[in-house]
């Protein structure tokens, strides 16, 4: 059985331990993951997916009441989400799945749609954060809506427009609790103010709890010369860079994954999590608020390379390969 989201092939021994056939079907469909103990854990939906559902429902409700919508996720799967929508006003609450630490769990997204002359327009409202300075990917005052979820939201709005037969619609998206919840996220420390970010490269939230960590460790321990990566972007490019190796998505569980790995290990992904793991104080005295900003600056090589050299001396069997969002290798161990 293969996970349709990550591509990971579940060992037969894990599948045999599952006592819930319905849960196994969810794993097969991608809405859940399977752990080494046979436990089935549900994936949740990202802020981007929730926003897309609210926006789509708002437009659809201009033609009648709506209680559920189907969203085509960035990962290629589809998801059916409950909504409350009537007369252009829609509400959708974020479902966290089996991820108890999700501070945005249950948060409400509100979308208000109005008929327009032609095409679609998304207006970010209260509760959606905005950038307070220019960054490598966003300009000052731009809303904190990442590329993949923005595309998902806009395509969902287009689908709704086609279904209603309307020629155009403007949707204002807001998150009433966004400003308050943002204080519990990293946004204030990375130059985003006014609310939370709308994120989600796959549209799904991974259930990173202790059970899944055990499975990550089991995946790494069972591989020869594994490649460990921290996120979806890293996963995609690691598979391209190392097609003959087992690539394991470890999220923030880098320490445990490295400890379990056998043979020569490659740690591959975007610089932020990896460099912060290797050197927690990497940003000290650099003048940058995030590793992403540092990585886009001319001073990055002079900061990163000495750190990678020192780490290689301390951990000679671990090779570090850092990539940017376009898949270019921007730094690696000597």
UniProtKB/Swiss-Prot annotation:
Q: Which keywords does the record carry?
A: Cobalamin biosynthesis, Methyltransferase, S-adenosyl-L-methionine, Transferase
Starting at the broadest rank, the lineage of the source organism is: Archaea, Methanobacteriati, Methanobacteriota, Stenosarchaea group, Methanomicrobia
The Gene Ontology biological process annotation of the record reads: anaerobic cobalamin biosynthetic process; methylation
Q: Which reaction does it catalyse?
A: Co-precorrin-5B + S-adenosyl-L-methionine = Co-precorrin-6A + S-adenosyl-L-homocysteine
- Does the record bear ATP-binding in its keywords? no
Q: Which GO terms describe its molecular function?
A: cobalt-precorrin-5B C1-methyltransferase activity
Could you tell me which Gene3D superfamilies the record lists for this protein? CbiD-like (3.30.2110.10), CbiD-like domains (3.40.50.10720)
Record keyword ATP-binding present: no
Q: One Pfam match, by short name?
A: CbiD
Q: What is this protein called?
A: Cobalt-precorrin-5B C(1)-methyltransferase
Give the pathway listed in the UniProt entry for this protein. Cofactor biosynthesis; adenosylcobalamin biosynthesis; cob(II)yrinate a,c-diamide from sirohydrochlorin (anaerobic route): step 6/10
Q: According to the UniProt entry, what is the EC number of this protein?
A: 2.1.1.195
The record's annotation in InterPro entries points to: CbiD (IPR002748), CbiD_sf (IPR036074)
Superkingdom in the source lineage: Archaea
Q: Which family does it belong to?
A: Belongs to the CbiD family.
* PANTHER family hit by this protein: COBALT-PRECORRIN-5B C(1)-METHYLTRANSFERASE
